[in-house]
C-alpha cells in the first residue's frame, strides 16, 4: 500500500503525512469526541474515483446511515432521478435557496451550482442518524467551519492517473474535452488531500468499503 501511494504522489512533500492516515490510532479519538447524536462524514475525491459507488454501498449496508442529497443546477443524466440522485433546480430557484441561507455549503463545480440543504443534514443528526455527504474540498471546508470541526473527513484517491482516465472514459457520458478538463481539475483537487482526516486509495471497492466502515464505527 505504501509503495502505491508513493508511486501516485511522488511529487508530494507530505509523503510521511499521507502514509500515516488510517494508521495512527490517535485519529480514532476524534470519533469519540464528537457528540453522539449522529456522526457527519464527508467523502471527497476527484470525479471518477468511485465515491458515489462506495457511498451507495455504505447506505445499503446500514439503515441508520443517510446519504445527503445535493441540490444542483446541472442537467439530469440518463437513469438519474430527481429527489434520489439530486434535487434538480433552476439557477433562479437555487439562488433563492442560497439567499434564504438554506445551505450548509454551496459551490460552483464545472459551471454548475451545487449545495447541501441545512435542514436535511441537521434534522438527521439531531435524531441520531449518521449522515454521509459526497462533496468536493470547497464544500468540505464550509461544512467543517459550520460544524466547528465535528465532522469526519475522508478523501479517496484513484490507483493512478491512468486508471482515472480509464474510468472517466468508460462512463461514456463525457467528451474527450470534458475528460481532459476533469483530469486537470482532479490534479488540483488531489492537492487538498492533507485537509482530510483519512486518505484511502480506491483500487478495490470492497476493501475501501471495509476501511470506511471501521473509520465510522
Each model region followed by its residue ranges:
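ATP-dependent small-molecule kinase phosphotransfer cores
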Residues: 72-131, 137-138
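The conserved Walker
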Residues: 47
Amino acid at each position: 500500500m505504501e509503495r502505491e501511494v508513493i508511486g501516485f504522489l511522488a511529487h508530494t512533500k507530505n509523503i510521511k503525512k499521507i502514509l500515516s492516515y488510517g494508521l495512527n490510532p490517535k485519529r480514532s479519538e476524534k470519533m469519540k469526541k464528537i457528540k453522539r447524536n449522529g456522526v457527519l462524514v464527508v467523502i471527497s475525491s476527484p470525479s471518477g474515483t468511485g465515491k458515489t459507488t462506495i457511498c451507495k454501498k455504505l447506505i445499503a449496508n446500514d439503515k441508520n446511515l443517510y446519504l445527503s442529497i445535493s441540490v444542483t443546477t446541472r442537467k439530469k443524466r440518463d437513469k438519474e432521478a430527481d429527489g434520489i440522485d439530486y434535487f434538480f433546480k433552476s439557477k433562479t430557484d437555487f439562488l433563492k435557496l442560497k439567499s434564504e441561507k438554506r445551505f450548509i455549503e454551496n459551490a460552483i463545480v464545472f459551471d454548475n451550482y451545487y449545495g447541501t440543504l441545512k435542514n436535511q443534514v441537521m434534522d438527521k443528526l439531531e435524531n441520531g442518524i449518521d449522515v454521509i455527504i459526497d462533496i468536493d474540498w470547497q464544500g468540505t471546508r464550509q461544512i467543517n467551519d459550520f460544524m466547528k470541526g465535528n465532522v469526519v473527513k475522508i478523501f479517496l484517491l484513484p490507483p493512478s492517473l491512468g486508471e482515472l482516465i480509464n474510468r472517466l472514459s468508460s462512463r461514456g457520458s463525457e467528451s474527450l474535452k470534458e475528460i481532459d478538463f476533469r483530469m486537470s481539475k482532479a490534479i488540483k483537487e488531489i492537492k487538498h488531500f492533507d485537509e482530510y482526516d483519512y486518505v484511502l486509495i480506491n483500487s478495490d471497492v470492497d476493501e475501501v468499503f471495509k476501511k470506511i466502515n471501521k473509520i465510522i464505527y
